[in-house]
Design a protein with these regions (language model features):
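Intrinsically disordered, low-complexity segments enriched in small/polar residues
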Residues: 17-152
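Sec-dependent N-terminal signal peptides
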Residues: 4-15
Length: 153
């Protein structure tokens, strides 16, 4: 059976690369098999092997002691806005020590379009003229400091 390799690249823009895993852990879960896909490292990049047609979700687990903004993209497309991905875009705020399961691109507050492993020509990004990052799962993680509220006297 032919397999498709999806590359998971973790971009930590607010901290050093050596801190990967300290702000958040990122996993890819095959929804049909109900299991986390094993990560294979090669030349500094993380890869997971997906089965064609299987839906998957991206799981972000906040490992920081404060809230984190996660700007996540799949195939070079921001999962919240649907725009071509950029680190400065909107994302999800994840409370400290909590996790978030992202099962697809946000279509509305109640609907998502599922992520699934497929051939390049069938990918959403390629069909919308953005094939350059198909197979890449990216995340820019920002620690969010809470402003303290003081009562005025």
């Amino acid at each position: 059976m032919k397999t498709i390799i999806a590359s998971a690249i973790l971009l930590l823009l607010t901290t050093q690369a050596s801190a990967i895993g300290r702000i958040a852990d990122i996993a890819v879960v095959d929804r049909q098999l109900n299991r986390t896909l094993q990560v294979h490292w090669h030349e500094g990049r993380a890869y997971v092997e997906g089965r064609p047609g299987n839906e998957y979700q991206v799981v972000v687990r906040n490992q920081a002691g404060q809230d984190v903004l996660a700007v996540v993209s799949v195939d070079g497309v921001n999962v919240v806005t649907g725009e071509t991905a950029a680190p400065s875009q909107g994302g999800y705020v994840i409370d400290s020590w909590q996790s978030l399961d992202i099962a697809g691109w946000r279509k509305s507050l109640s609907r998502t379009a599922a992520f699934y492993f497929t051939e390049l020509s069938d990918s959403y990004a390629a069909r919308t003229g953005r094939p350059h990052n198909v197979g890449v799962i990216g995340a820019a993680l920002y620690q969010i400091g809470r402003a303290s509220c003081r009562e005025r006297v």
